[in-house]
Amino acid sequence: MHRIDVKLLDPRLKTHPPAYASAGAAGLDLRACLDAPVLLHPGETTLVPSGLAIHLADPGLAAMVLPRSGLGHKHGIVLGNLVGLIDSDYQGQVFVSVWNRGRDVFTIQPMERIAQLVVVPVLQVGFNVVDDFAASERGEGGFGSTGKH
């Protein structure tokens, strides 16, 4: 298992540390480190502290903050920035931009699992500027060009 440096900024995380929910889980659950419940009305967004700071340090890694599927499907709670990207040299607290795209007021409870953190490999590339590409089967075919279903 790859290891990264982490600071637990909220003392409650000592009893609820970031963890994988199962052996096959890709994401670590992030908790809402709030002092009191927050009401999120339809269409509103708010920044929720995770109580966690990470430093990936390795430029070959990045972390993504992703929504929890149940919150999105059942309550319309997704991320305000859709995907949060954390660079390897960032060392600050991880915040979650929470957006209520549902029709009902949603209450974010203190220490509720609000999002998930997935660490992924990153390949930094350089560009070769060209006038033309070598021909491929797809060419410039864009949206819908490979079929309907």
Swiss-Prot record:
Q: Which reaction equation describes what this protein catalyses?
A: dUTP + H2O = dUMP + diphosphate + H(+)
Give the family per the record.
Belongs to the dUTPase family.
Q: Cite a single GO BP annotation.
A: dUMP biosynthetic process
For the protein in the UniProt heading, the enzyme class is hydrolase
> Per its UniProt record, what NCBIfam families does this chain match?
dut, PRK00601.1
| Name recorded for this polypeptide | Deoxyuridine 5'-triphosphate nucleotidohydrolase
- CDD domains recorded: trimeric_dUTPase (cd07557)
Briefly state the protein's biological role.
This enzyme is involved in nucleotide metabolism: it produces dUMP, the immediate precursor of thymidine nucleotides and it decreases the intracellular concentration of dUTP so that uracil cannot be incorporated into DNA.
Species: Azoarcus sp. (strain BH72)
What this protein needs as a cofactor is: Mg(2+)
EC numbers, comma separated: 3.6.1.23
PANTHER family per UniProt: DEOXYURIDINE 5'-TRIPHOSPHATE NUCLEOTIDOHYDROLASE
What domain of life does the UniProt record list for this protein's source?
Bacteria
Could you say which residues bind substrate here?
68-70, 81, 85-87
